[in-house]
Amino acid sequence: MTTPGPTPPREPAKAAPRQAGLLRSTAVFSSMTFVSRITGLVRDQVYAAVFGANPAMDAFLVAFRIPNFLRRLSAEGSFSMAFVPVLSEYKERRDHAEVKELVDRVTGTLLAVLLVLTAVAVLAAPWVIRVFAPGFDGNAEQVELAAQMLRITFPYLLFISLASLGGGVLNSYRRFAVPALSPVLLNVSMITAALALAPRMQQPVMALAWGVFAAGILQLAFHLPSLARLKLLPRPRWHGGH
């Protein structure tokens, strides 16, 4: 009489929910990316229709390019590459309280650095513009306009960096929708500023600078409810070790 062998593990049954979750996450991310691309295209069309190509628009593009460039270096560059693996390790090996403490300390340190950087950029705005746009040197009015807008747009770096930190936390917990949808808020804010605010301003292009500022606040605020549901809403604490 043959003795039945051990029952093989049911790997496919266990893998199925994981695979379904991965497909769902991919679909959500792809959909939000598509929406972001479409709203970005609409934004560019609105820019062309409302402002056209002129020195004032060039001044705005420089004033926005500076914090956007630094965002790619910090929030989406080396900082994220360093933080996300550490957070993942904490999730696997530490309890929730220690994960929360890590998020609080990283947020506090990032906030302190960004506040100093923002203060320096706001105070030295004309010099910063000359470094990033040396072609403006012969046009004092354009430098001044770009500097005025940089003082409004540069805090976007602070808001979006904190939002990206929150997005990294959410992604590590497989909450992909909010970080993926966040760029849409920037496009919608810019479109609204161009269509609704610009006609009411003495210097219409300044509306775009305020649109950037508002977008940063919206993108940061958009992440907070999801972080709160994970009980990881940051309470910034500065610590030299992180």
Indicate residue ranges for each PLM-predicted region:
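Membrane-embedded alpha-helical bundles of multi-pass transporters/translocases
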Residues: 2-242
